[in-house]
Curated annotation (Swiss-Prot):
It comes from Bos taurus. GO terms for biological process: maturation of 5.8S rRNA; maturation of LSU-rRNA. This is RRP15-like protein. There is a cross-link at K112, K183, K212, K243 (Glycyl lysine isopeptide (Lys-Gly) (interchain with G-Cter in SUMO2)). Pfam families: Rrp15p. The gene is RRP15. The modification Citrulline is found at R9.
């Protein structure tokens, strides 16, 4: 745009110069013509028709010279205009080429697309990256759901009783573990005392002690606890069996209800607690 504005200004200045030259030439021609007319008038009075013919020839010759001068002046600026226009176009093309070369030679960051082709490629790459991230997030969400499927956060306020039971179980387990450790240590100390002061026997005893011994002691503790629990359960079961062996107060609840009675005497069966038959029918007959 700046080059075009400069070219227009140059052409306008040249046109003004040409117009001023033309005006000057016209003024010169007019002054020469007026002088010739004055001379013609003077010569006409003295010489006559011959002088007038010569003046006409001079007038025409001067006019032709003026026209030729104008044509030459017009031809010269036209050539100058053509040369200046060619130079201006060449300069504009060179400037445009330089600007494009600078733009293309610049190292542009990927985040700022300046060319449409690069912009499209970057958009495609960004879409691919977004899809990959979404797929990874979906896979991670699935894994978390699978891991957290059976996990439930306990509510301490609502599950107070369950928490207390768990605490009791934990305390029992810890107490049992420490008791087993203490018992195992006592057993080892007793065996060492029995061995006496011999170092070999002590070394053999210490080497013979293994994890299995401790686990057996721990299992023995578990067995004793389980035996106690089983004994308590057996006593409770026996009590329930004794209660069940006792006959119910109502005869309908017995297992042998209506097993020995005949169907004809069904209306004579009493609903009393003693199970005796009432002879209502016989009394009424008598």
């Amino acid at each position: 745009m700046a080059a075009a504005v400069g070219d227009s200004r140059v052409s306008a200045g040249k046109k003004l110069k040409i117009s001023l030259r033309k005006k000057r030439m016209k003024m010169v021609v007019a002054s020469v013509a007026s002088e010739l007319e004055d001379k013609d008038k003077d010569a006409s009075d003295n010489e006559g028709s011959l002088g007038s013919c010569g003046l006409e020839k001079d007038h025409f010759s001067s006019g032709d010279e003026a026209v030729e001068a104008d044509n030459e002046d017009e031809a010269e600026p036209r050539e100058d205009d053509n040369d200046s226009a060619a130079e201006a176009t060449a300069g504009a093309n060179a400037g445009w080429a330089d600007a494009m070369a600078r733009i293309l030679s610049k190292k542009i960051p990927e985040s700022k697309p300046t060319i449409l082709v690069r912009n499209k490629e970057l958009e495609k790459e960004k879409e691919k990256l977004k899809q990959e991230r979404l797929e990874k997030r979906k896979q991670l969400d699935k894994k978390r759901e699978w891991e957290m499927m059976c996990r439930v956060k306990p509510d301490v306020v609502k599950d107070k009783e369950t928490e207390r039971n768990l605490q009791r179980i934990a305390t029992r387990g810890v107490v049992q573990l420490f008791n087993a450790v203490q018992k195992h240590q006592k057993n080892v100390d007793e065996k060492v005392k029995e061995a006496g002061g011999s170092i070999r026997k002590r070394a053999k005893l210490i080497s013979s002690v293994s994890k299995k011994d401790f686990i057996s002691v721990l299992r023995g503790m578990d067995g004793s606890a389980s035996e106690k629990n089983s004994a308590g359960k057996n006593s409770k079961a026996k009590q329930t069996e004794a209660k069940s062996e006792e006959g119910p107060g109502w005869t309908i609840l017995r297992d042998d209800f209506m097993m020995g009675a005949s169907m004809k005497d069904w209306d004579k069966e009493s609903d009393g607690p003693d199970g005796s038959r009432l002879g209502c029918g016989s009394d009424s007959d008598t």
